[in-house]
């Protein structure tokens, strides 16, 4: 997971480099052994998913005829690492991790404790219309 603290290394690792380039020294981030897959995770990251390749889906050319080779890679999660410092009462404290998200263009956003919120999911009746929408904060019940 890319976080506020790892943003510079994450950005450096987005550079186009030859396929055999080890991006860890380039990024300044530290490799850590994974439990179920060969590739290492990023030690500085508070969370990581270990995945096995399932499918690579080619995307159409943005500009027809340019054949840039854009793909979506899909994997099965076979292992999860979460730093214990971010577990509160059995739940992940996402805000404390301060993950970042790619928005668009060169823009990113950061999740902070003061921007995280929880709300109840609505229940829906058999014909698919919303039967109950409780706008209050999440009550701890999964629906």
Show the residue positions of the predicted features.
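Basic, polyanion-binding surface patches
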Residues: 1-143
């Amino acid at each position: 997971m890319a976080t506020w603290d790892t943003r510079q290394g994450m950005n450096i690792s987005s550079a186009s480099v030859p396929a055999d380039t080890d991006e860890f020294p380039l990024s300044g981030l530290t490799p850590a052994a994974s439990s179920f897959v060969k590739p290492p995770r990023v030690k500085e990251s508070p969370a990581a998913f270990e995945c096995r390749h399932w499918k690579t889906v080619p995307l159409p050319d943005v500009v027809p005829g340019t054949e840039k080779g854009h793909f979506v890679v899909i994997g099965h999660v076979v292992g999860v690492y979460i730093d214990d410092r971010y577990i509160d009462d059995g739940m992940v404290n996402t805000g404390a991790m301060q993950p970042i998200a790619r928005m668009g263009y060169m823009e990113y956003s950061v999740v902070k404790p003061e921007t995280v919120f929880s709300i109840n999911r609505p229940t829906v009746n058999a014909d698919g219309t919303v039967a109950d929408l409780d706008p209050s904060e999440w009550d701890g019940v999964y629906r």
